Amino acid sequence: MTKQHAFTREDLLRCSRGELFGPGNAQLPAPNMLMVDRITHISDEGGKFSKGELVAELDINPDLWFFACHFEGDPVMPGCLGLDAMWQLVGFYLGWQGNPGRGRALGSGEVKFFGQVLPTAKKVTYNIHIKRVLKGKLNLAIADGSVSVDGREIYTAEGLRVGVFTSTENF
């Protein structure tokens, strides 16, 4: 079977409903927390570490929910949403690889913010570089990522960690 290497908004919504990777497996959050409109490229080869990569995008418009509340009179996309999007994509990668279980963000190393997403922006691009995938009792991916707005890098994160668990009862 050939793996799909790009995903539309509808594909991602199917993933948020648990329909893409099957019941009980990795899901993306539903809107409004789904911070990705499309995955333009996913591969288990390539990237900075030659272990896999993802490129995804979010279309920006002034009507997005977070601009109304963060901050009044000074609208900016919360940086934590960009960080969460990177975790979402690492979890998606694990599901795409066929790892069973529900995804959970497990942490990260260094995160740096050196720019912002304003309502005047057009597009956010996420780049994820898989460093390592551990398979066993816990399936875990470790990745580095970056967020760019209209072609300019504004956030980086090292050591993004996401695991998939067949049971989250004792998590």
From Swiss-Prot:
Record's function text = Necessary for the introduction of cis unsaturation into fatty acids. Catalyzes the dehydration of (3R)-3-hydroxydecanoyl-ACP to E-(2)-decenoyl-ACP and then its isomerization to Z-(3)-decenoyl-ACP. Can catalyze the dehydratase reaction for beta-hydroxyacyl-ACPs with saturated chain lengths up to 16:0, being most active on intermediate chain length.
Per the UniProt entry, what species is this protein from, by scientific name?
Pseudomonas savastanoi pv. phaseolicola (strain 1448A / Race 6) (Pseudomonas syringae pv. phaseolicola (strain 1448A / Race 6))
Subunit annotation: Homodimer.
A matching Pfam family? FabA
Its localization reads: Cytoplasm
UniProt-recorded Gene Ontology molecular function terms: (3R)-hydroxyacyl-[acyl-carrier-protein] dehydratase activity; trans-2-decenoyl-acyl-carrier-protein isomerase activity
Instruction: Describe the reaction catalysed, as an equation.
Output: a (3R)-hydroxyacyl-[ACP] = a (2E)-enoyl-[ACP] + H2O; (3R)-hydroxydecanoyl-[ACP] = (2E)-decenoyl-[ACP] + H2O; (2E)-decenoyl-[ACP] = (3Z)-decenoyl-[ACP]
By its UniProt entry, which Gene3D superfamilies does this protein fall under?
Hotdog Thioesterase
Q: Which domain of life is it from?
A: Bacteria
Instruction: List, from the UniProt record, the residues annotated as the active site of this protein.
Output: 70
Q: Which GO terms describe its cellular component?
A: cytoplasm
Describe which pathway this protein belongs to, using the record's wording: Lipid metabolism; fatty acid biosynthesis
Any one Gene Ontology biological process term? unsaturated fatty acid biosynthetic process
* Family from the record: Belongs to the thioester dehydratase family. FabA subfamily.
Protein name in the entry: 3-hydroxydecanoyl-[acyl-carrier-protein] dehydratase
